[in-house]
């Protein structure tokens, strides 16, 4: 039992020693690299950490809004960052020149310190990424001449070009051609019925002639 306790105490002591060593190493790195210190102070993101990017010195508005932003965020925890920025910009415009002057002096002091600390610093604005053009899009000339085969009702193939007017016209012609014999038969029947009705309206002699011309009917 004592052997188990001694091993646990020994393991805990080793972990405590490693933690102390890591803290000592990190503190040495902090004091020996001023560039990384400035980067950590300005809260650089992970993308710029490999390049040790130096940020610009704060201007008068940034100096003033540093404390004001924290105050507004505490008073309005539900307000978004964009809304806070709009409100701070409006409040900054409402200040007089006398009220802004201390922040301009502080910004000038910070710029002087920045020049001494980074004499080779040059402002390099980030370029906005251009949207990539897709090669799948067809030019206007080729898209206007697009022609493809489409099946309507699985029995009327027609050609589609620029609009559906030709297809609709050809489809209507097919329907008219298919129904044309029925229409012709109906028209012939109407003509025969009209001729019979007009002939029966004539004289009694004509009616007798038509009746005698008909074959006799014998019921079965």
UniProtKB/Swiss-Prot annotation:
InterPro entries: HMG_box_dom (IPR009071), HMG_box_dom_sf (IPR036910), SRY (IPR017253), SRY-related_HMG-box_TF-like (IPR050140). Residues 54-122 bind DNA. Keywords: Activator, Calmodulin-binding, Cytoplasm, Differentiation, DNA-binding, Nucleus, Repressor, Sexual differentiation, Transcription, Transcription regulation. PROSITE patterns: HMG_BOX_2. Pfam families: HMG_box (PF00505). Interacts with CALM, EP300, HDAC3, KPNB1, ZNF208 isoform KRAB-O, PARP1, SLC9A3R2 and WT1. The interaction with EP300 modulates its DNA-binding activity. The interaction with KPNB1 is sensitive to dissociation by Ran in the GTP-bound form. Interaction with PARP1 impaired its DNA-binding activity. Belongs to the SRY family. This is Sex-determining region Y protein. The lineage of its organism: Eukaryota, Metazoa, Chordata, Craniata, Vertebrata.
């Amino acid at each position: 039992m004592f052997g188990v306790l001694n091993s646990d105490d020994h393991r805990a002591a080793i972990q405590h020693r490693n933690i102390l060593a890591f803290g000592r190493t990190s503190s040495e790195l902090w004091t020996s690299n001023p560039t990384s210190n400035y980067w950590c102070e300005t809260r650089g993101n992970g993308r710029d950490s490999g390049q040790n990017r130096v940020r610009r010195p704060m201007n008068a508005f940034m100096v003033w809004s540093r404390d004001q932003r924290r105050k507004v965020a505490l008073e309005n925890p539900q307000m978004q960052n964009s809304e806070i920025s709009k409100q701070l910009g409006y409040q900054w415009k409402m200040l007089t020149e006398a009220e802004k002057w201390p922040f301009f002096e502080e910004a000038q002091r910070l710029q002087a310190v920045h020049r001494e600390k980074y004499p080779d610093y040059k402002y390099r604005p980030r370029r906005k990424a251009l949207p990539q053009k897709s090669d799948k899009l067809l030019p206007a000339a080729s898209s206007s001449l697009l022609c493809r085969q489409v099946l309507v009702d699985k029995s009327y193939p027609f050609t589609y070009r620029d609009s559906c007017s030709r297809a609709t016209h050809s489809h209507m012609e097919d329907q008219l051609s298919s129904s044309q014999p029925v229409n012709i038969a109906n028209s012939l029947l109407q003509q025969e019925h009209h001729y019979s009705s007009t002939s029966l309206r004539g004289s009694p002699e004509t009616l007798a002639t038509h009746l005698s011309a008909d074959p006799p009917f014998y019921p079965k």
